[in-house]
Amino acid sequence: LFACLITTACALAECAGQAEKTSAEFAEELKKLAARCTAIARAMDFSVLYDNTRELFHIGCSFEEGKLTPSHYDLLASECRLTSFSAIAFSRIGSEHWFALSRLMCDASGGRVLKSWSGTMFEYLMPLIFFETVPYSMQFEVCRNAVLTQILAAAAEKPWGVSESGYYAFDDALRYQYRAFGNPELALAPGRMRSDVIAPYACVLALAVEPKAAAENLRLLCQIGAAGKYGLYEALDYGAAEKNGFAIVKSYMAHHQGMSLCAINNALNNNVLARRFMSVPEVRANEQLLFENMPVDPIRIKTYELSLIHI
């Protein structure tokens, strides 16, 4: 939300500058909206969730219990790195937090990657809506290699793009269920991951690093029925096969549609949202955090198949 507000403020300011040529009154209204967005963003207090001892953010808080959750966001390959960077850039926390985030690296089929918790496209790619990336930087290479790993894992003539999404299971009210799906090579807990649910929004996010492959995959998704009246459906569940080999999760989630629209906007308009966010002076002053090099001789880990013992 913080990055959205800051980016929206930049867009409104740009529009105000253009509107001044035709309507001074309208331009003034746009400026007021931009100032309001900026004020809301700058009033946010990140420190409430920050653990100064561990230099990490808590996952959240329990209002029922009146305390913070004991778990933390401790991986660099996480959607939370957008929050981490924003909090550092706007002087809410110190830059030591960035270097406290785990950089656990492994050799996946698509290349060297940082481990994420669930191996989802959301964890790797969502921040790229707002971050400019530099080829050969760790962020760019890890995100691209994560996408390549998912591409290589896809069966022949089947689409790719695994992330957290709805799937073809229902509760008592016949609402689709939701959980994280990820690639086992990328996830810290591979034994818990299913990778047979394809989320079209995950492919749209991949436009940031593999635009040609993503466009071809989106074309395939549309050909096999993933597009509906209001855009791309939530998911294709290959674990709940019907006569065509999968079941379509015919729902639309606002945040997935929003991320998709932003990613498409970036792809068509020279990374416009990222350029706006990165143009803010506080962000520009800290951009070197995003350009960290891929380590020449990283510490790697081996992954093992988890076995379940039935008693």
Which residue ranges define each predicted feature?
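Ser/Thr/Asn(+Pro)-rich, low-complexity disordered segments
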Residues: 1-308
